[in-house]
Amino acid sequence: MRIGHGYDVHRFAEGDFVTLGGVRIPHRFGLLAHSDGDVLLHALCDALLGAAALGDIGRHFPDTDPRFKGVDSRVLLRHVVALVREKGWRVGNVDATIVAQAPKMAPHIERMRLSIAEDLQVGVEQVNVKATTTEKLGFTGREEGIAVHAVALLLAL
């Protein structure tokens, strides 16, 4: 059994939606990133990679590599799951906390869970996503960006 933690942040930029957990959410800003900016999936990738002692997302998908420009982060997550399996591990469960003042996450959480479960090849009951604000404190409270913490439990195949 292995446990990993992931954390990622993206700042807001020009745009009219954010993608979180593979779900497109209307918003008055987008997220600045080399890929599609799915900060939730990036944190999950790091948690999975960390649990398997495989480094981090930047090592596997560097933002200097043009192949990953604008890439759908679901593709990255699926690749990470394959790497983890090659090392003899399977996902036991994942849990993530989105830290954002806006947009409101509650209407989108279940679709995020379903999308993530599909990519992880696990049941939706093995995926938890929740959201909180910082009561208008810090960069997320000032609506400058979104942060996500994620943990993953891996079990031997």
Swiss-Prot record:
Q: Which domain of life is it from?
A: Bacteria
Q: Which cofactor is essential here?
A: a divalent metal cation
Record site: Transition state stabilizer: H34, T133
Q: What is its EC number?
A: 4.6.1.12
Matching InterPro entries: MECDP_synthase, MECDP_synthase_CS, MECDP_synthase_sf
Q: Name one GO molecular function term.
A: 2-C-methyl-D-erythritol 2,4-cyclodiphosphate synthase activity
Sequence positions that bind a divalent metal cation = D8, H10, H42
**Which Gene3D superfamilies does the protein's record reference?**
2-C-methyl-D-erythritol 2,4-cyclodiphosphate synthase
Q: Give GO BP annotations, semicolon-separated.
A: isopentenyl diphosphate biosynthetic process, methylerythritol 4-phosphate pathway; terpenoid biosynthetic process
PROSITE patterns according to UniProt: ISPF
Catalysed reaction(s)?
Answer: 4-CDP-2-C-methyl-D-erythritol 2-phosphate = 2-C-methyl-D-erythritol 2,4-cyclic diphosphate + CMP
User: Could you tell me the keywords of this UniProt record?
Assistant: Isoprene biosynthesis, Lyase, Metal-binding
State how it assembles: Homotrimer.
| Role of this protein | Involved in the biosynthesis of isopentenyl diphosphate (IPP) and dimethylallyl diphosphate (DMAPP), two major building blocks of isoprenoid compounds. Catalyzes the conversion of 4-diphosphocytidyl-2-C-methyl-D-erythritol 2-phosphate (CDP-ME2P) to 2-C-methyl-D-erythritol 2,4-cyclodiphosphate (ME-CPP) with a corresponding release of cytidine 5-monophosphate (CMP).
In its UniProt entry, what is this protein called?
2-C-methyl-D-erythritol 2,4-cyclodiphosphate synthase
Tell me what gene encodes this. Answer: ispF
